Amino acid sequence: MPPSSAAEGSTKRKKGGAAPHLKSRSKNARKLKRSAEDAEIAQLEQGIQAFVSPIDLKQFTQLPLSDRTCRGLKRAGYTDMTDIQAKSLSLSLKGKDVLGAARTGSGKTLAFLIPVLEILYRRKWGPSDGLGALVISPTRELAIQIFEVLRKIGSYHTFSAGLVIGGKDVKQEKDRLSRINILIATPGRLLQHMDQTLGFDTSNVQVLVLDEADRILDMGFSRTLNAIVENLPRNRQTMLFSATQTKRVKDLARLSLQDPEYVAVREPENEGCTPRGLEQHYMLVELEKKLDLLFSFIRTHTKCKALVFMSSCRQVQFVHETFCKLRPGVSLMALHGKQKQAKRLQIFTQFTKTQHALLFATDIAARGLDFPAVDWVIQLDVPEDVDTYIHRVGRTARYTAKGNSLLFVLPSEEKGILEALATKNIAIGRIKPKESKTQSIQNQLQAFAFQEPQIKHLAQKAFVSYVRSIHLQKNKEIFDVTALALEPFAAALGLPGAPKVKFVKEAAKAKKAAAYKAAQQQADDNSGQVKGDSDDEQAERADKNGKVRTKYDRMFERKNQDILSKHYANLIADDASSEQDSSNDSDTSDDDSVSVATTDNDDAEDREETRYGRSAGRRKENRLVGSDTSDSEEDESDDEQNDSGLHKIKSETKRSVMAARGDGDDGFLTLKRADHALEDDGDAYGIGGDDTRITMEQAKADATENLSKRKLAMGQSKKALALAGKRGIGEKLIFDEHGEAHALYELQDEEAFNKQGDAKTQAQRWAEEERERMQQADAKDKELAKEKRREKRRRQKEREKALERGDAPDNGDEGGSGDDDEEEEETGGRAVLAPIDNRSDGYETPDFDLTTEEDEDDDDDADDDDDDDDEAYRAPAPKRRKMAPSAGVTSQPSHSKKSKLEQEEELALRLLAGDA
C-alpha cells in the first residue's frame, strides 16, 4: 500500500473507531487492569491490617501504600518522612480518628493527604460515587496551598479534586461540585454551597480533615462548623492537625470522634513549641518609635526575605502606602483581609517566588502558609496569645532551615508577655537597637498627611484600629489601652492631633472603678479580721460589698418604720400608771417635785410657741417623736435613728404622764395634748395656748404670716405643687341618702367589708347584679329598636299608599311629617335597621292625569312640606334636555318647585309626544 493510502487508511480508522481486533484487545486490557487493581487493593488491605510500625520508620516506601501514591510522592520529591508523618500515617491508614500536633513546618499536610488518597483508592471510589473526602482550612491561602500539594502527589490517581474558597465565582463552582471526589474548602463558602447548591450531597463523605483545627474550632467558626458537621455522616473518619492542638472534650464531642488517637511529636523539656532553628528576640520600644525602628530595620536588611505582622488591616494599608513612598530599597507587598481574592492570590504567589522582599500582613498569613526561605518574622504588635505567637514565628525556620524572629514590645506589655511565653517554655532574648542606625520618619509622614488627604484619612483609620485592637484584647494584664501614649503616637503617624476615641475614656473609667472596688474589698477583708467581729457580721458586710444595692433593696431592708407613736405612747402610759399605783404611798415627795419640774417645762414650751408661732412647737414635737418620719439612705443610720427615736418617745411620754397627774386622784393620767389633731384633720388642726381648737386654715394663716409675698407665690406655683405631688389631685365627693359626704373611691375597713361576706361571695354577687342589670338594659334596647322599626315601616307604607292615590301626605301623624324625624334626631340618633321595601322591583306604568295650572299650584303648595323632609337626602334634579313642542301638546309653564311624581309624569308625556 502506498504511503498515501496507508495514511488515509489510518485516518479512516481514527475517525471510524478502532478495528475489531483492537477493540477486543483493549477490552481484554481493561479487564486485566481491573483484575490487577483488585489484587493490589486486596494486598494493601492485608498489609494495612498486619502493619506494625517499626522503630526506624524513615521512608514512605516502608509503608503499605499504593503504587500510584508512591510514584506521586517520588515525582514531587518526597522520600523521607518527618516525625509526625511516621507516627500518624500508621494509624490514619487503618481508618482511625487522629488528633495530630507538631511544630510548624513539620509536614502535617502530607500526614492527612496521603490517607485521603489511599482510603478512597482502596474503596474503589469513582466519579459516580460523589464526594468522598472533605478538607477544611481556615484561610484561603492555606486552602490553595493544600490544593497544590494534592495535585502534586495525586497526579497518578483518577480522582477529581476541587477548591472552593471565598472570592471566586459561585455559579461556576456550583456547576462542578457534583463531579468532585476530593474537596478542599473554607468554612464559609462550604456552608453556602450546602445551603444553596442543588445536587451537592455530603451524606457519603468518608474522610473529614480539619487543618489548623484549633483555629476552626474557636469562636470565629463555631456556628459554621456546627452546621457543616450536622450534614455529614457519623461513620466517617476524622483527622485534626495543628501546631497547637486542642484537647477540650467539648470541641471533640462536636465532631463525633470515635476513640481518637492523639499523636504528638514530643520535644525535649528544654525546648518549646517553636522550630529548632529559630532564634527569637524582642525589643523594648515606645509606641511612637515603632515605625522609626521598623523602617530602620528594613533599610539595613535589604538583602533578605521578611514577613511583618500587624494587628489590623488599616495598619497594613497605611504602613505599605507610606513606606512605598519612602523607597527603602526593597520590594514591599501587603496582604490583608480587605483585598479581593485575585489580588491576594497574586501577592501570595509573587512573595513565594521572590528572593528578596518584605510582606506586611495580618494574621491571615500566620497559619499554615509555607513561604520558602523566609529569613525574618517581625511582629510589630504583640500577639493576642502564645498560640498566635507560635504560628507567626513558624513562617520561618521551616523543617530544618534557619530563621529569626523579632517582637516589638511596649514597656507596659513586657512583664505580661514574658510570663505568658514562659508557660510554653519559649526562651526569648532582649536586644537593643543601634542609635547610630536609627532613622526618624515622622517629618516625612507629616508631609505625606499634609499633601495627600487620603494618607491622612488612612492614618486616622490606622490609629483608631490599633487602639480598638488593644481595647478588645481579653488579657488586660498585657494589653492596657489606658497606658498608651496616644498623642505622641498620633504625631508619629503624621497626624496633627490624636483622634477622639470614645472607648478609651470608658476603659479608664472602668479601670478606676475596678481599682476602687479592689481597694474597698481589701479594706473590708482587713476589717473583717479585727477581734470582736462575728461571722454573721462579716457575712453581712461581704454581701453588702459583693453586689450593688438599689433603692428597692434599701426600702425592703428598713426596720421599725411602721411604729405608731400614739399607740406606743398609750402602751408606755399604761406601764407608767401601773408603776405609779405601786409606789404612790412611798414616793409622794418625788412625784411632786417631778410634777413641778414638768409643769415648768410645759410653761417654757408654751412661751416658746407664743413667741415663734405654732409651727415651732410642732417642729419641736416632731423632732422628739418623729422616728417614723425618717427616711435614711443607709441601714446603719436607719437603725440608729429608730433607736434614738424610741428612747425619746419613751422619755417624753413618761414626762407628760407624770406632769399630768395633779394633787388629787381626779387628775390621774390626764394628758395635756393626748387627743391633739394630726395634720390631716381639717376641723381640729391643733390646740392653742388656752386649750382652744384651731382649724387647719388658721394654722396655715399663722404659718404664712412671716413669709413674703414672693415666697408665698413660689409655694403656690405649678412647679412647687408638682414637686409636692399635689398638682392635679382633686377631691371628688358623693353624698349618700342621709346627706353625708363620702369620697368617690372610699375604702372600707376590714370589719365593714367582712360584714357583707367574704371576697369571693361579694364578687359573685356583684357579677350577678351586673349581669341582671345588663340583661334588663339589653331587653329595653331591643324593644325600643323594634318599636322604631315598626313605626318607620308603618309611615313608609302610609306614604306609599298616599302616593298611589295621588294625594299629598298630610303633616299629621299618618303622613309621617317632619316632626317625627325631628323627634328621632332629638332622641340621640340611635341606630336601627333599614325599613323593609315591599314594592316589586319591576317597572309600573303610572296613570297619567293631566291637570290644570291652578291644580298644579295647589298640589305644589301641599307637597312643599313633604319635599322638605327629603331635601337633605336628595341631590338636586339634573337638567333635562329641552325638546321642541309638538302639535297637540301644550307647553307647561315652569314652576320653581314640583313634586317628584309630577316631574316623572311630565317627562313621560314629553317622551310619548316626541315618539308620536
Swiss-Prot record:
It comes from Mycosarcoma maydis. Its EC number is 3.6.4.13. The Q motif is unique to and characteristic of the DEAD box family of RNA helicases and controls ATP binding and hydrolysis. Interacts with the U3 and U14 snoRNAs. Associates with pre-ribosomal complexes. Residues 89-263 form the Helicase ATP-binding domain. GO terms for biological process: rRNA processing. It comes from the Eukaryota. This is ATP-dependent RNA helicase DBP4. The lineage of its organism: Eukaryota, Fungi, Dikarya, Basidiomycota, Ustilaginomycotina.
